[in-house]
Design a protein with these regions (language model features):
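Canonical Rossmann dinucleotide-binding motif of NAD(H)/NADP(H)-dependent dehydrogenases/reductases
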Residues: 2-34
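Conserved glycine-rich Rossmann-like NAD(P)H-binding loop of the short-chain dehydrogenase/reductase
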Residues: 29-53
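The beta1-alpha1 cofactor-binding region of Rossmann-like NAD(H)/NADP(H)-dependent oxidoreductases
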Residues: 48, 69-80, 112
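Rossmann-fold cofactor-recognition segment
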Residues: 56-75
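Substrate-binding pocket helix/loop in short-chain dehydrogenase/reductase
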Residues: 58, 106-107, 114-116
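A glycine-rich helix->loop->beta "capping" turn
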Residues: 61-64, 84-97, 103
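A short, exposed helix-loop element centered on a Lys and neighboring polar residues
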Residues: 130-131
Length: 144
């Protein structure tokens, strides 16, 4: 096993790209993974359960993973992601806030709703996913 043996990692935006590669690497190093991905394309269109594909790949490599489809843009979504980890593994050791969206427009052409969507995922999403983890760390005295 690797340096993350039996650690539990939540990785948001893990259905594609950097998040997926991080999930695969962590799994190879022995971590149990919560693969979170809403399943939308970076521009917000579509909805596929791509997290299932990453979970299947991790399991094919001998790892352990579960999928989660909640959006990081709401506090409830962040709590549900954390709950998925606790329900599946009983602990959380690592949170990687990787989820992101793209509104490929210049500021001149951007609507306020585009800006709000980006901030909800890229900024508030970090808070929504990290706060339950930080509270858990403090409440379980895992600061060391």
């Amino acid at each position: 096993m690797g340096i993350l043996n039996n650690k539990v990692a939540i990785i948001t935006g893990a259905g594609r790209g950097i998040g997926m590669e991080t999930a695969l690497l962590f799994a190879k190093e022995g971590a149990k993974i919560v693969v979170n991905d809403l399943g939308a394309n970076p521009d917000g269109s579509g909805h596929e359960k791509i997290a299932d594909e990453v979970v299947a790949e991790i399991k094919a490599l001998g790892g352990d993973a579960v999928a989660n489809y909640d959006s990081v843009d709401s506090y409830k979504g962040g709590m549900n992601i954390f709950s998925t980890a606790m329900d599946a593994y009983g602990a959380v050791d690592i949170v990687i806030n990787n989820a992101g969206i793209l509104r490929d427009k210049t500021l001149f052409n951007m609507e306020e709703s585009d800006w709000d969507a980006i901030m909800a995922v890229h900024l508030k999403g970090h808070f929504n996913c990290t706060q339950p983890f930080v509270r858990y760390i403090r409440e379980t005295n895992r600061l060391n």
